[in-house]
């Protein structure tokens, strides 16, 4: 096919590097929290803000950032994001108190929000649809490797250096990505349109309030205290955003996309999947470290079966999509993912690692088949001139689902654990397995340690059953809503894409 960019596969490497730096930073930081907390003398609230400030800013600015890429140039916005992310990472290496780290994390969140939508939108504009599946599979594989490998990398860096190295490792990767982007990557943008400042403000306020509400659920409940205020702000702002985008002449986000079954169905399916997946690392990492007594590095290596299987699924899915279309891969993949959660829910304190290893391999294979196909079906409905904001919609949907999953599954795990602990257990022992094991070690109480591990695995079983239900619901929704289509094949949609583009711009 004429018109293909001869550098497109090199450009894909740049996009993968840009995505990888975000994934690795977020996951590796979780390993560094204990060391950072001790060194900075941070309170529990400080630690929470170090972790949450990034996601609040990141999720709140995604839609606005995607729109900026469409208007001013996706490469330009991505490079600005990389510069900001790299500078903030470098600043974090010299921080001496929690407030400075939080400020650096806020700046990194802004940079990340500029980077993430641009990577997927550039991929869509550089690759023709017949090659897009392979490109998205490779892009997804790198993200999966970063997700699995970053806890291992974090453990190695903490063991040999300090928590500062978690941030410093971003800098050379950012420099390499910026250099390669300037040399290899062409600029792309949509047709110029009038700015939508009110839409940008409403989306940023609404998404930030929504994510904050989700974060506060485990502490205050869904409708208690400050949670209710956050929810009210989110409902008013996002409701106003929807109304405004439907009446303004040149909307920032073309909400007409949600009239497309593949877009709306794919969006909701991805949300449900991310709710199911959201707490997986949180739950399993604790199981591996506190029940099986793995070191942080060994716990990270335990996810290798998932990474390998995901690579196989991504590779197989890229070829199968062209032959059988998106829908079968989404259904089979999500079915495997649901089955893996069911298998994980059978684990107890004496199971060991064999069953989790098999379940993680199934999960990786299912995710490798389903996730690129679901994103491909969703993104296939977006006109090229709206690739940036369309990518941002996809990112926002998945971020909200992940945050909601962590909140729901984290609450279930905590409450289930407390309920299963023996009557008369101390408050620290009932609050977490970490507290129980610390107390058991201090008192040489093997019975308390065993009870804590039994309580944790029982709560984990309930939590992962809910995860299975969420992913199964996503599969059923996809079965009902998604229309099958092969990449490059014409479809007879309810609203032609020409009309979408016309309404969008």
Where are the regions that the model predicts?
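Transmembrane core module of solute transporters
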Residues: 8-58, 62, 162, 172, ...
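Transmembrane-helix bundle of Major Facilitator Superfamily
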Residues: 1-183, 316-317, 324-328, 335-338, ...
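C-terminal membrane-cytosol helix-exit motif in multi-pass small-molecule transporters
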Residues: 172-188, 206-215, 234-247, 474-482
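Hydrophobic transmembrane architecture of multi-pass small-molecule transporters
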Residues: 176, 376-377, 381, 393-483, ...
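Hydrophobic alpha-helical segments of secondary membrane carriers
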Residues: 138-142, 269, 393-397
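Short helix-capping/hinge motifs at transmembrane helix termini and TM-loop junctions
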Residues: 95-97, 128, 184-187, 218-219, ...
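Conserved aromatic/hydrophobic "specificity hotspots" at molecular recognition or selectivity sites
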Residues: 159, 163-202, 246-249, 259, ...
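Membrane interfacial helix motifs at helix-loop boundaries and amphipathic/re-entrant anchors
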Residues: 28, 32-49, 91-103, 154-167, ...
């Amino acid at each position: 096919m004429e018109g293909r960019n001869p550098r497109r596969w090199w450009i894909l490497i740049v996009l993968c590097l840009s995505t990888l730096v975000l994934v690795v930073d977020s996951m590796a930081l979780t390993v560094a929290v204990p060391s950072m907390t001790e060194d900075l003398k941070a309170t529990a609230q400080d630690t929470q803000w170090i972790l949450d400030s990034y996601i609040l800013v990141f999720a709140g600015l995604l839609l606005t950032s995607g729109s900026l890429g469409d208007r001013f140039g996706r490469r330009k916005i991505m490079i600005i994001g990389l510069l900001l992310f790299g500078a903030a990472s470098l600043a974090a290496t010299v921080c001496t108190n929690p407030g400075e780290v939080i400020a650096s994390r806020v700046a990194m969140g802004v940079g990340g929000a500029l980077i993430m939508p641009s990577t997927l939108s550039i991929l869509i504009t550089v690759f023709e649809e017949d090659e897009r599946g392979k490109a998205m599979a490779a892009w997804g594989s790198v993200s999966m490797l970063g997700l699995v490998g970053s806890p291992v990398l974090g453990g190695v860096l903490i063991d040999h250096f300090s928590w500062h190295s978690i941030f410093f490792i971003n800098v050379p990767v950012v420099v390499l990505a910026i250099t390669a982007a300037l040399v290899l990557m062409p600029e792309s943008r949509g047709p110029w349109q009038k700015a939508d400042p009110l839409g940008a403000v409403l989306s940023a306020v609404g998404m930030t309030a929504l994510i904050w509400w989700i974060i506060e659920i485990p502490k205050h409940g869904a409708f208690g205290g400050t949670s209710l205020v956050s929810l009210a702000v989110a409902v008013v702002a996002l409701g106003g955003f929807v109304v405004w985008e439907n009446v303004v002449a040149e909307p920032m986000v073309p909400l007409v996309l949600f009239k497309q079954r593949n877009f709306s169905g794919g969006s909701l399916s991805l949300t449900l999947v991310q709710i199911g997946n959201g707490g997986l690392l949180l739950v399993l990492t604790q199981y591996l470290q506190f029940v099986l007594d793995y070191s942080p590095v060994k716990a990270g290596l335990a996810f290798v079966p998932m990474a390998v299987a995901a690579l196989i699924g991504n590779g197989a899915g890229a070829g199968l999509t062209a032959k059988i279309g998106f829908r079968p891969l989404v259904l089979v993949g999500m079915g495997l993912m649901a089955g893996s959660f069911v298998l994980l829910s059978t684990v107890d304190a004496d199971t060991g690692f064999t069953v989790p290893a098999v379940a993680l391999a199934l999960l990786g294979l299912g995710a490798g088949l389903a996730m690129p196909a679901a994103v491909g079906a969703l993104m296939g409905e977006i006109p090229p001139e709206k690739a940036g904001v369309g990518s941002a919609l996809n990112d926002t949907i998945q971020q909200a689902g992940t945050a909601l999953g962590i909140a729901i599954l984290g609450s279930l795990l905590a409450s289930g654990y407390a309920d299963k602990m023996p009557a008369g257990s101390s408050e620290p022992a009932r609050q977490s397995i970490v507290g129980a094991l610390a107390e058991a070690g201090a008192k040489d109480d093997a019975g308390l340690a065993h009870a804590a591990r039994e309580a944790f695995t029982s709560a984990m079983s309930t939590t992962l059953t809910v995860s299975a239900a969420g992913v199964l619901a996503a599969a059923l929704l996809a079965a009902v809503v998604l229309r099958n289509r092969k990449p490059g094949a014409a479809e007879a949609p309810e609203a032609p894409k020409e009309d979408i583009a016309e309404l969008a711009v």
